[in-house]
């Protein structure tokens, strides 16, 4: 099994699943015998798929793949995580506001970094 790094700040951007949602996800993965969607990584650090990866730790026989994405920096990665999470249907209004705020902060930092480079 590939050992991926878990970044607490990245993981914090991902709203937790309810117990029922987590159990359903685990059942689906076990039924398929593999992950249907690859885990998203940046420099060997998990960006998307934290819940699936946690399930894989309990079931190392399950096949999975990873898709590496390129980001210039942590802020760009956080902005991507927030945009991706905002596409989820089960977010509460509070979770949406939090993610929008974090996305805005991260994109503002990215813009500042690129402005200083030019």
Label every PLM stretch briefly.
Residues 10-22, 26, 31-32, 52-118:
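Amphipathic, charge-rich alpha-helical segments that serve as recognition/docking helices
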Residues 34-38:
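N-terminal BTB/POZ boundary and linker segment
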Residues 41-45:
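Short active-site oxyanion
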Residues 49:
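Short, conserved phosphate/pyrophosphate- and ester-handling motifs at nucleotide-, phospho-/glycolipid
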């Amino acid at each position: 099994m590939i050992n991926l790094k878990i970044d607490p700040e990245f993981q914090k951007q991902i709203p937790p699943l309810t117990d029922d949602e987590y159990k359903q996800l685990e059942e689906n993965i076990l039924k398929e015998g593999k992950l249907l969607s690859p885990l998203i990584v940046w420099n060997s650090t998990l960006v998307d798929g934290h819940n699936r990866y946690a399930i894989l730790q309990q079931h190392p026989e399950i096949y999975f793949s990873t898709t590496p994405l390129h980001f210039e920096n942590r802020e760009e990665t956080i902005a991507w995580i927030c945009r991706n999470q905002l596409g989820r249907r089960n977010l509460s209004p509070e979770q949406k506001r939090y993610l929008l705020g974090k996305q805005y902060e991260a994109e503002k930092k990215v813009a500042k970094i690129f402005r200083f480079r030019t």
